[in-house]
């Protein structure tokens, strides 16, 4: 039986953007944490774990809490790679079940793409309506995890957490925008691409609050408003000291760019999450301010 009096965190997928940030946050706050990787050339402190290799799962049985961040997340790969369904819908739920049977609390990082984006601010318990392969795989993973752990009597150890779009200054197309603006060149931005962005700092801090609690359930982390890339570009340009005249408005269709997911609404309702943890959605002004630090 795991001793929960001394928390030990395992970030599964600790070499990805979010996973790496989670590991750094826990270490900075003097928490005992390990990150996992299936790559041999990763951080020397990383523990080997491969979703498809069940004999590697026992490598983290000394943890009390596991955060499943990894998986196949690229939209196009989820659509075209047959392994995506196997990893995302079968292996990850089986891993969550395995860990829960060893009395380890499991937080599964899902996505706002379990919803179609046709309705604003879906609540934590709203019915799923995915239109994207990636969203369908996340939806199926959620349902498989909950069903399998319910049958095993370990569902009370499971948390599902859905963030909206996480932005950093390295998130495409922001680096290209900034490079162009620095040369006084205009950029084309898409009016039909809607996001409810949150920053890496916000999501990591909020995730740590949720993960460290004993509360099971489904929770949302979202930006406070739906904003298109044209208006996001104008806000960002202004914050960086560039003229908003350098931000052109177009659409992905007009630009001939194939974007797999164009939701009308991207934001998530956070009523249940706010009530449970006091976590509020992140205002767009805070997003831009943090990005421009």
Annotated model-derived regions:
Residues 48-89:
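NAD(P)H-binding glycine-rich loop region in Rossmannoid oxidoreductase-like domains
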Residues 83-94, 128, 132, 136-139:
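Glycine-rich NAD(P)-binding loop of the Rossmann-fold in SDR/ketoreductase-type enzymes
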Residues 206, 213-259, 265, 292:
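Mid/C-terminal beta-alpha module of Rossmann-like enzyme folds, strongest
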Residues 94-131:
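Conserved Rossmann-fold NAD(P)-dependent oxidoreductase catalytic core, especially the SDR/UDP-sugar
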Residues 189-194, 219-226, 276:
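Glycine-rich Rossmann NAD(P)(H)-binding loop
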Residues 143-195, 201-202:
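NAD(P)-dependent short-chain dehydrogenase/reductase
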Residues 246, 261-293:
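C-terminal amphipathic/interface module of NAD(P)-dependent oxidoreductases
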Residues 2, 7-29:
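N-terminal Rossmann NAD(P)H-binding glycine-rich loop of SDR-like oxidoreductase domains
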């Amino acid at each position: 039986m795991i001793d929960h009096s001394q928390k030990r965190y395992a970030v599964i997928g600790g070499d990805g953007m979010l996973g790496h940030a989670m590991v750094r946050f826990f270490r900075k706050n003097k928490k005992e944490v390990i990150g996992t990787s299936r790559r041999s050339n990763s951080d020397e402190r990383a523990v080997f774990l491969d979703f498809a290799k069940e004999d590697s799962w026992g490598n983290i049985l000394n943890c009390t809490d596991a955060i499943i961040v990894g998986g196949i997340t690229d939209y196009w790969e989820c659509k075209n790679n047959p392994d995506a369904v196997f990893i995302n819908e079968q292996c990850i739920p089986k891993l969550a079940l395995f860990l829960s049977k060893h009395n380890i609390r499991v937080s599964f990082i899902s996505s706002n793409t379990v919803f179609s984006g046709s309705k604003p601010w879906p609540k934590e318990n709203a019915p799923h309506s995915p239109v994207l392969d990636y969203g369908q795989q996340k939806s199926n993973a959620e349902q498989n995890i909950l069903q399998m752990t319910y049958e095993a009597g370990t569902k009370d150890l499971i948390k599902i957490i859905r963030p909206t779009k996480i932005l950093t200054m390295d998130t495409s197309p922001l680096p290209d925008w900034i490079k162009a603006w620095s040369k006084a060149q205009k950029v084309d931005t898409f009016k039909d691409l809607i996001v409810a962005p949150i920053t890496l700092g916000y999501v990591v801090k909020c995730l740590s609050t949720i993960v460290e609690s004993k509360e099971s359930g489904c929770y949302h982390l979202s930006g406070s408003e739906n904003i298109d890339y044209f208006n996001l570009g104008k806000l960002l340009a202004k914050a960086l000291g560039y003229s908003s005249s350098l931000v052109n408005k177009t659409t992905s269709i007009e630009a001939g760019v194939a974007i797999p997911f164009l939701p009308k609404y991207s934001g998530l309702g956070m009523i249940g999450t706010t009530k449970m943890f006091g976590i509020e959605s992140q205002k767009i002004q805070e997003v831009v301010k943090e990005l421009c630090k």
